[in-house]
Amino acid sequence: MAAAVADEAVARDVQRLLVQFQDEGGQLLGSPFDVPVDITPDRLQLVCNALLAQEDPLPLAFFVHDAEIISSLGKTLESQAVETEKVLDIIYQPQAIFRVRAVTRCTSSLEGHSEAVISVAFSPTGKYLASGSGDTTVRFWDLSTETPHFTCKGHRHWVLSISWSPDGKKLASGCKNGQILLWDPSTGKQVGRTLAGHSKWITGLSWEPLHANPECRYVASSSKDGSVRIWDTTAGRCERILTGHTQSVTCLRWGGDGLLYSASQDRTIKVWRAHDGVLCRTLQGHGHWVNTMALSTDYALRTGAFEPAEASVNPQDLQGSLQELKERALSRYNLMRGQGPERLVSGSDDFTLFLWSPAEDKKPLTRMTGHQALINQVLFSPDSRIVASASFDKSIKLWDGRTGKYLASLRGHVAAVYQIAWSADSRLLVSGSSDSTLKVWDVKAQKLAMDLPGHADEVYAVDWSPDGQRVASGGKDKCLRIWRR
């Protein structure tokens, strides 16, 4: 294949270059070979797939340094000051095999909550949708008919945080008076006893990963009271209390390698060993409250054993024994994680983000500046290659997920951007704003794909189902909206 490309170039008398394919980790593929300078990504794809000898050709993207080859190699080289006398390294990146299409219309406007909708979350397979509200209830919605399913009463204050277990069989909800309740989405009934112990409101909930424990027994909570607690949901008791933060803990992540990460208004992020609660290290660098953080492996941890490329039109529960689910989740996690340890990105009231490798080092990999106001949310794309951050400065910014390098600003909202969600194929991003709209962004083109007005007031919460079929949003108008293509 490489020889055929070279022969064709000779026939056309085009300038030629010596190139070498390598993967993102620097692993060489084949030997250097000769290509015409005007070679297109389609031709590179043919050659690269021939060298990879895959049964099914992979969709690939190609990069010279950080610049993607969009129309031809020559055009990309013109925009980069690249030395073409030597062998030119071309990095290939496998892309998602399936494609998520942008949602374009609101298919349902679901009323039922009597106060603002504070959080919305699809279950790991996209079968269920849950919402938490200022009216003290959690609601489950039937996605096949797009109608209310169950109203769950038990909290006595605003429901601030909800989180699905990675097997999709339980939802944890935390409220303003510090209590945590567990719910069964198939019945709408409370599971086990109320988990009480925090003295102030719950700021975050995070489950132990499926590949670590397929029974999904443990959930961690963070609170305004400055502590993190690990709960045994089967026994209904607090297993461990992690103390050390001097102010409110704002968010929490249970990583895939046995570490828990907590971020706080004391400007630090603490890294804990989940199985015994030992503090491993404290990450310092932010000049103000740390509001938000995300892991490069978040999508694999959220979806566990669910593979979106194999999803059916009507989402189902996960099938298989606990051991099979554990093995599937572990292989998906390892594939996502790659060679290095998971990366963490944090966003702060000081307008900056930091990229960390928290399992290895307490110093940040890089500091990311550019936002003009505090950062509300930060998220890695499902393939972990891009970080998106949403801010009170009305913009969303995109950053390289490995280096932290600034890539682009997505502008269009006319007020604060509260929350963002990625499509499963990492090609699209949806944002919800104080300006009452949702917007869908094409990440590669770095432009607006779809403007979605419809809410009557601020949009606080947005989520994209893991199978890519639906977006759900909620906010101050008490209405939950479902959007489809």
Swiss-Prot record:
Record keywords, A-Z: Acetylation, Notch signaling pathway, Nucleus, Phosphoprotein, Repeat, WD repeat
Spans annotated as Ubiquitin-like (UBL) domain: 14-96
Species name: Pongo abelii
Functional description taken from the UniProt entry: Plays a role in regulating Notch activity. Plays a role in regulating the expression of CDKN1A and several members of the Wnt pathway, probably via its effects on Notch activity. Required during embryogenesis for inner mass cell survival.
GO cellular component, one term: nucleolus
Origin superkingdom: Eukaryota
Subunit structure: Associates with the pre-60S ribosomal particle. Interacts (via WD repeats) with uL18. Interacts (via UBL domain) with MDN1 (via VWFA/MIDAS domain).
Keyword Acetylation carried by entry: yes
Signal peptide positions on this chain: none
GO biological process terms on file: Notch signaling pathway; ribosomal large subunit assembly
Residues annotated with N-acetylalanine modification: A2
WD repeats (start-end): 112-151, 154-193, 197-241, 244-282, 325-366, 370-409, 412-451, 454-485
Subcellular location: Nucleus, Nucleolus
Cysteine disulfide partners in this protein: none
InterPro entries the record matches: G-protein_beta_WD-40_rep (IPR020472), Gprotein_B (IPR001632), NLE (IPR012972), WD40/YVTN_repeat-like_dom_sf (IPR015943), WD40_repeat_CS (IPR019775), WD40_repeat_dom_sf (IPR036322), WD40_rpt (IPR001680)
Gene3D superfamilies: YVTN repeat-like/Quinoprotein amine dehydrogenase
Lineage: Eukaryota, Metazoa, Chordata, Craniata, Vertebrata
Protein name: Notchless protein homolog 1
Family designation: Belongs to the NLE1/RSA4 family.
